[in-house]
Amino acid sequence: YAAFLALGEDACAAAWEMDTVEGAREDSACLLTLLHRPSRLQLALLLEAKDSGCVADALGGIRAVLGADGMRRVFRAVLTDNGAEFSDEAAIAALLGEGPGETRLFYCDPRRSDQKGACERNHVELRKLLPKGAGLRFDRLAPADLALAMSHVNSEPRGALGFSTPARAFRAMLGDDAAALLDAYGVGDVALGDLDLTPGLIERARAERGDAPLA
């Protein structure tokens, strides 16, 4: 973490934070979340299991969208915790486009998840749709559920952004790379009057598709 801070204030402010979010105790699946500090844009990707191989697969999916050059443009610094799912430092760093003599992947100090507090705080918004302790089965989640959830989360105006939305701010900051990433994961703009940050949003969409409830 000291090396992360040594990047300087501007680089730290422009970094990403990476974490995982768990569902019910009996689930194998979990979510990989990536938060872009400047825009507050958060992605949530489904992992079949909370392990380093699944994290690498998810980041590989992002790399397939952006390409090697795009990964280097977008993910200049990523801060995560010391969870076992992030233990394959070499694989993650390579996927981020880390070159010889540089570092793009950084770790919080042990037991200091507050050092990536923006990601943790934004999980509050995600948990409005997927509340903890409600018995929701992440093993049943589909990419369409996450696309819907993150479209709503990232369309909520934020005071820190001058009441713009994370999705709009992200596109303004990262242009075509941002548009490609959001399109690939189905994250679109939701009008203010249509915002729904309640568990019913996903359950209604699942019912319309004929999918079983999450709980």
Predicted segment positions?
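Mobile-element integrase/transposase regions
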Residues: 1-31
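Short, conserved catalytic/metal-binding motifs centered on acidic residues
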Residues: 18-19, 40, 78-81, 116, ...
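Short, acidic, Ser/Thr-enriched surface-loop or helix-capping motifs
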Residues: 36-37
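Short helix-terminating capping/connector loops at secondary-structure junctions
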Residues: 69-74, 100-102
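C-terminal domain-tail junction helix/linker
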Residues: 90, 132-215
